[in-house]
């Protein structure tokens, strides 16, 4: 990923979100409230007050892109503030590749590919189950 200076980040405003929802009648709205796609070099800084205000003003379920690296505590709070869907693709990819690497190192050339892929898929399933539990 590319590093972006904090002052260059464009956050969703309540006014923009409200206007967009009214004009488009979307079912869900992805908002920019302090997360980014990819791996973090620091801690995600979710702007919870902004998130809650957007949720209250729009009344639609909100989507959080860049959920990889967001702490469980921040994620639980974001869910109470209107987040209904979280994208954690990078975290799933990292788990899948790491598990494949470790499994391939232990395998033999003539092993079935399933021997390598099933553990990787199970690692992704574990990540998703952990994230889904944050919505309860």
Predicted segments with their positions:
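Short, ordered loop/turn segments at secondary-structure junctions
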Residues: 34-36, 67, 91-93
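Short beta-strand/loop segments at the ligand-binding rim of alpha/beta enzyme cores
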Residues: 56-66
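Alpha/beta enzyme core
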Residues: 1-58, 72-81, 86-88, 98-102, ...
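Extended, intrinsically disordered, low-complexity segments
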Residues: 101-136
């Amino acid at each position: 990923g590319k590093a972006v200076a904090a002052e260059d980040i464009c956050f969703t405003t309540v006014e923009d979100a409200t206007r967009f929802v009214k004009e488009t009648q979307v079912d869900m709205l992805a908002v920019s409230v302090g997360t980014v796609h990819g791996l973090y070099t620091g801690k995600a800084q979710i702007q919870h007050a902004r998130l809650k205000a957007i949720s209250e003003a729009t009344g639609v379920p909100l989507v959080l892109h860049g959920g990889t690296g967001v702490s469980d505590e921040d994620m639980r709070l974001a869910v109470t503030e209107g987040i209904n869907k979280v994208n954690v693709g990078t975290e799933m990819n990292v788990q899948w590749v790491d598990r494949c690497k470790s499994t391939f190192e232990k395998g033999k050339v003539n092993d079935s590919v399933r021997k390598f892929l099933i553990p990787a898929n199970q690692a992704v399933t574990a990540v998703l189950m952990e994230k889904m539990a944050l919505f309860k």
